Amino acid sequence: MLNPYKPNGELINLEDYPQAAAYLISHREALQKRHVAKKNPGKWYKTIDRIVPALKDSPKVLLPDISGNQLIFVDDGRFYPQHNLYYITGGSLRQLQLLSAMLMSDYVKSQLLSITNCMNGGYPRWQSQYLRKLVMPDVNAIEESLAERLLGAYQAFDMARLNDTMADIVSAPRAKSHRRQPQVQQLTFDFAM
């Protein structure tokens, strides 16, 4: 992936990066047709979103904008999300897997279906404006035996067991629910207590 930004977030000067310039110039015609380039012709090689190199190495939940697939995956730090792929960062890999399991549940799906505009055959959208409205159990407040059961169901893609476990978590008297607010980038959950 070619990142046209300096570490401080400024767009690079192509004269200072001849190899990047050669590559970008070879695709200039196509790049100039984009809305972002038409808006600012002097910065025709600018990307719509700034690239954050550290994001690639961070564990994250990957969410497609629209998908008929009920499975949600956690990247342990090998991929960079682009285009219509949202991500959630924060917490440990285990916490992100618990969050993914909860997001795959019928409990969350029913909430999403009631608050989103469904697209492409009735599939809900995973945009942050909708995710902010979800009522979710606090991953740090889930009883350990239920957390292990939920992780086992998630790792086995056993949706029946996952939904049964999620129902037990939601009905548990000690489970706290929180509406999480994004902090930076597309969507970030803060797992601090």
Which sequence ranges carry the predicted segments?
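Polybasic, glycine- and aromatic-enriched phosphate-binding surface used to engage nucleic acids
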Residues: 1-148, 152, 166
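Non-catalytic DNA-recognition/assembly elements of restriction-modification systems
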Residues: 19, 138-193
